[in-house]
């Protein structure tokens, strides 16, 4: 069983839902990434999604685009991100880390080399935003050889055939993007999310995390009542962006603790 599957199994036994925060590696600067990862865990994160900076992050809204730009100013690339995970692993072996990014840096490194290096550094899963399931059998095979979970995005507009392909290929969890468009948008329709999750669960047996549009405890709590995991990215990046460097850890820690408390309120009632 993968570390991600182990975490979800433990949470199920505890009647809890997973909190999965996202940060971009190298934002606000490379020295802050590993301390931020530890802060996320102390504040209640179950799994960390770590973004690999990319110059053309087409699926991301302006907040996460800016975080990528800040990291790229410090020349943070895929090798640096893997080194950050390795550093995190020197003192945390139990919190899964999922790399989230785009295909280009992975292709530049090569599938086999990337998968081997990611495993060696302590990565648990990989979500490549711009790899549709129908085009990435070879990529997924390289991940599986290294016992890395291949994680996929689904959205309100994903066609049925692709949902079925994801159901066959995905491991760890599936990330359901609850809004059309780019990250950081608002206006989450919980009724629509509930109905879509019911549909997805008729095909997908692994946990489903919901993200995009979760900006506060109330929304996190509502989503936790529907999904297996709550994914929060843009709201955390905003906190990093607006806080002075000396206050970033405390500000992010406060936000994540609030989200954790809200999620646990609903989980404990089930």
Q: What residues fall within each predicted segment?
A:
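Active-site mouth loops of central-metabolism enzymes
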Residues: 19-33, 98-110, 149-158
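Catalytic cores of alpha/beta
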Residues: 30-40, 158-168, 210, 214-230
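Glycine-rich phosphate-binding active-site loops on the catalytic face of alpha/beta enzymes
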Residues: 45-56, 123-127, 132, 174-184, ...
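Short beta-strand/loop segments at the ligand-binding rim of alpha/beta enzyme cores
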Residues: 14-20, 92-102, 143-153, 201-211
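Active-site-adjacent beta->alpha loops and helix N-cap segments on the catalytic face
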Residues: 1-11, 30, 55-66, 73-88, ...
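Structural motif
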Residues: 43, 121, 169, 203, ...
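Alpha/beta catalytic cores of nucleotide-metabolism and tRNA/nucleoside-modifying enzymes
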Residues: 198-205, 215-270
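Conserved, mostly hydrophobic/aromatic
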Residues: 21, 40, 51, 118, ...
């Amino acid at each position: 069983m993968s570390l991600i599957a182990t975490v979800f199994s433990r949470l199920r036994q505890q009647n809890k839902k997973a909190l999965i925060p996202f940060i971009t590696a190298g934002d606000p600067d490379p020295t802050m990434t590993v301390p931020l990862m530890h802060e996320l865990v102390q504040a209640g994160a179950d799994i960390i999604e770590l973004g690999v900076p990319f110059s053309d992050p087409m699926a991301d809204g302006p907040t996460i685009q800016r975080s990528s730009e800040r990291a790229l100013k410090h020349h943070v690339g895929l090798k640096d991100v893997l080194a950050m995970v390795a550093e995190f692993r020197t003192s945390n072996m139990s919190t899964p880390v999922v790399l989230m990014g785009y295909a280009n840096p992975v292709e530049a490194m090569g599938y086999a080399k990337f998968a081997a290096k990611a495993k060696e550094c302590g990565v648990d899963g990989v979500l490549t935003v711009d790899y549709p399931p129908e085009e990435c059998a070879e990529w997924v095979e390289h991940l599986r050889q290294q016992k890395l979970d291949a994680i996929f995005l689904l959205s309100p507009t994903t066609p049925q055939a692709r949902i079925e392909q994801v159901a066959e290929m995905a491991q760890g969890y599936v990330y359901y993007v609850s809004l059309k468009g780019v990250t950081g948008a608002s206006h989450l329709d919980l009724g629509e999310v509930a109905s879509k999750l019911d549909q997805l669960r008729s095909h997908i047996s692994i946990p489903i995390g919901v993200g995009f549009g979760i900006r506060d405890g109330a929304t996190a709590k509502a989503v936790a009542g529907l999904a297996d995991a709550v994914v929060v990215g843009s709201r955390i990046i905003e906190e990093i962006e607006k806080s002075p460097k000396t206050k970033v850890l405390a500000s992010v820690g406060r936000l994540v603790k609030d989200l954790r408390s809200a999620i646990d309120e609903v989980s404990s009632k089930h």
